[in-house]
Amino acid sequence: MAKKSMIARDVKRKKLVERYATKRKKLLDEFNSAKDPMERLEIHRKIQALPRNSAPSRMRNRCWATGKPRGVYRDFGLCRNQLRERAHKGELPGVVKSSW
């Protein structure tokens, strides 16, 4: 189980990303379409003025069952240990153990 403070930090980051998503997208579109270097510099400063944790690249995928940050399968939102455990119990529909 991950530390509760780390899970809370990621939840906080997720909220910030959602809150600033439209503003960040608008600024990035302006930045990419701007031709004048001084205009690009000004837009870049505006992007940098946004909260650091509002960038989507700072979010971390975590297992929803345990909060572990590594070995998380995107399709299920579970870490590898939980995925194996729940698949063996038959709690994941459509998942079968491989055999050849």
UniProtKB/Swiss-Prot annotation:
Entry annotated with the keyword Cell division: no
InterPro entries, sorted: Ribosomal_uS14 (IPR001209), Ribosomal_uS14_bac/plastid (IPR023036), Ribosomal_uS14_CS (IPR018271)
Domain of life: Bacteria
Transmembrane segments: none
Keyword set, alphabetical order: Ribonucleoprotein, Ribosomal protein, RNA-binding, rRNA-binding
Pfam families referenced in this protein's UniProt entry, alphabetically: Ribosomal_S14 (PF00253)
GO biological process, alphabetically ordered: translation
Gene Ontology MF terms: rRNA binding; structural constituent of ribosome
Alphabetized Gene3D superfamilies for the sequence: 1.10.287.1480
Gene Ontology CC annotations of this record: cytoplasm; small ribosomal subunit
This protein's record includes keyword Cell wall biogenesis/degradation: no
NCBIfam families recorded: PRK08881.1
Similarity field: Belongs to the universal ribosomal protein uS14 family.
Protein function: Binds 16S rRNA, required for the assembly of 30S particles and may also be responsible for determining the conformation of the 16S rRNA at the A site.
Subunit structure: Part of the 30S ribosomal subunit. Contacts proteins S3 and S10.
Protein name: Small ribosomal subunit protein uS14
Protein encoded by which gene: rpsN
